[in-house]
UniProtKB/Swiss-Prot annotation:
Its EC number is 2.1.1.228. NCBIfam families: PRK00026.1, trmD. One of its GO terms (molecular function) is tRNA (guanine(37)-N1)-methyltransferase activity. This is tRNA (guanine-N(1)-)-methyltransferase. The lineage of its organism: Bacteria, Bacillati, Actinomycetota, Actinomycetes, Micromonosporales. Homodimer. S-adenosyl-L-methionine binds at G112, L136, G137, D138, Y139, V140, L141. The gene is trmD. Belongs to the RNA methyltransferase TrmD family.
Length: 257
């Protein structure tokens, strides 16, 4: 995968040399380039922002440097990348979107600052490439850099060969619309707390059922919206019994066997 990131703080992305993302870069699985937006300014002050039309607080990022940056990194006539713009006004980022982005060959991130990027930049970009405005959640950050770090980590770990055990992707939170069950390791007893006996039983069927039950209970308690979004046919009678025991009425519909 080829990724370009444009920011006025390129040094913000130094952590992308570390851990599994760093390995993905070293192996060529992830080809990442970080660009300074100010490289596309032409005044002595390297200006990237100005006051907003219509008044109001803060500053808005000017269209000229952004236009030149996008022209340079996504030349007209070439295969367009997918442009991602982190913004509190964007669609919520999710594991499903991470999987969608992991299938792209070229991602281009535009890190806004201040009150955001002049809307004309995004409107013009949308005429020649797919544009997705994306939000990490219902809160506001100083800029898009933190969001890009989060999105890149979520996407990179889905690329082939990045994780040593691809089975990790099947059991983790959000993989099947549920939060992950609690995890335990050695020792079996610690500070008067023992690992659940079923996990030490060696009975893989019982272990899988225990984990499913725990995932359902945890998701009901912490993210009832996720339970409500599950397809009724994805729940078997045992699932429904667990949910009802946790105080949640499973939606009516076909029942999984």
């Amino acid at each position: 995968m080829h990724v370009d990131v444009v920011s006025i703080f390129p040094e913000y992305f130094a952590p992308l040399d570390l851990s599994l993302i760093g390995r993905a870069r070293a192996s060529g699985t992830l080809r990442l380039a970080v660009h300074d937006l100010r490289a596309w300014t032409h005044d002595v002050h390297r200006t990237v922002d100005d006051t907003p039309y219509g008044g109001g607080p803060g500053m808005v990022m000017r269209p000229e440097p952004w236009g030149e940056a996008l022209d340079a990194l996504a030349p007209p006539g070439g295969t367009p990348p997918r442009l991602l713009v982190p913004t509190p006004a964007g669609v919520p980022f999710s594991q499903a979107l991470a999987h969608e982005l992991a299938s792209e060959s070229h991602l281009l991130f535009a890190c806004g600052r201040y009150e955001g990027i002049d809307q004309r930049v995004l409107d013009h970009a949308a005429s020649r490439m797919p544009v997705t405005e994306v939000s990490l959640g219902d809160y506001v950050l100083f800029g898009g850099e933190v969001a890009v770090l989060v999105i890149l980590e979520a996407v990179t770990r889905l690329l082939p060969g990045v994780l040593g055990n691809v089975g990790s992707l099947d059991d983790e939170s959000h993989a099947h619309g549920l939060l992950e069950a609690p995890m335990y390791t050695k020792p079996a007893a610690w500070r008067d707390r023992e690992v659940p006996a079923v996990l030490r039983s060696g009975d893989h069927g019982k272990i899988a059922r225990w984990r499913r039950n725990e995932a359902l209970v945890r998701t009901v308690a912490r993210r009832p919206d996720m339970i409500a979004a599950l397809a009724p046919e994805s729940l078997d009678p045992r699932d429904r019994a667990v949910l009802e025991g946790a105080g949640f009425s499973a939606p009516p519909g076909d029942v999984a066997e």
